[in-house]
Amino acid sequence: MPFSLLPRTIVHGLPDLTPKMLKKLGVELLMLDFDNTVVPYTTDVPTPAVRAWFRTMQASGIRLCVVSNSKKERVQQFCRQWDIPCFTHCRKPSRKGILRAAEAMKAPLQACALAGDQIYTDTLAANRAGVRSILVEPIHLHNVWLRLRHVAELPFIHLAKRRMKHEQSD
């Protein structure tokens, strides 16, 4: 797949991804980055809004899984708590972890999407794997490196928003 840093969709947070929206996009399997997408880096406890979103998504029939670069036990504990599959050591922006998750979940790539907070890892990996890339605003930019990375991503975010606006007007 092409090397692209432009997400196909941008949302404020996971609760903005509704089952209706995802079904309209043809998404059957939503892969989730973990840190700063589902929960902040500093905790494994989701906000009440994200907990409600998980319940809504699970009731909707859209399947969920976590694809994380992390190897930490806390990711696996979280996934056990919510009864969702977890794929760690994904090495995004490599596409291998995404392809491994899609194959394990028996989902065709065209029916998959990856929601994550980083363009240089999540968006790039999704685009390279041939799944829909969904950029979620980071939950918390708690240190200077995260803020600097986010600033470096802003040109791509602006380009993607312009493209999305143009596609909606067609």
Region spans (language model):
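Asp-based, Mg2+/Mn2+-dependent phosphohydrolase catalytic module
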Residues: 2-32, 39, 43-44, 48-114, ...
